[in-house]
Amino acid sequence: MRKKNDEDFILAYFEENEILGMVGFIRETGQKFRHKGHVWGVFVYPDHRRKGIANQLMLKLIDKARKIEGLQKIKLSANRTSIASVELYGKLGFKPYGTERNAAQYDGEILDEVYMDLQL
């Protein structure tokens, strides 16, 4: 079990008291790895995609992460077939550093994962 860390957070995007999207952030806890954090759970409901919600959430996440003392890098991964996600992360300054082949399976399809990071 992971020890609670006050620097971990979840951001949500609301419209008229309805949650339309969310993103999570978790900071590494080990002494050698505390300079890194991870983005997880980026999600926007399908009916609300392509409206800039993920962009707004990610901008807020990056801003919040920059204020965490000692944090130097944010990492994330995205399914290679999720072109919009990979492009969004690239526009936000994330750089790809590797691909994991056969990282996941969904509906019988084998999927590759692109790993990206942003130096703060």
Model-derived regions, located:
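Short amphipathic helical patch at the helix-1/turn junction of helix-turn-helix
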Residues: 44, 79-80
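Conserved G/P- and acidic residue-centered "switch" motifs that form tight phosphate/ATP-binding loops
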Residues: 52
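Terminal substrate-recognition subdomain of acyl/acetyltransferases
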Residues: 109-120
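Conserved catalytic-core motifs of GNAT/GCN5-like acyltransferases
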Residues: 75-78, 90-111
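Conserved GNAT acetyl-CoA-binding A-motif
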Residues: 58, 65-78
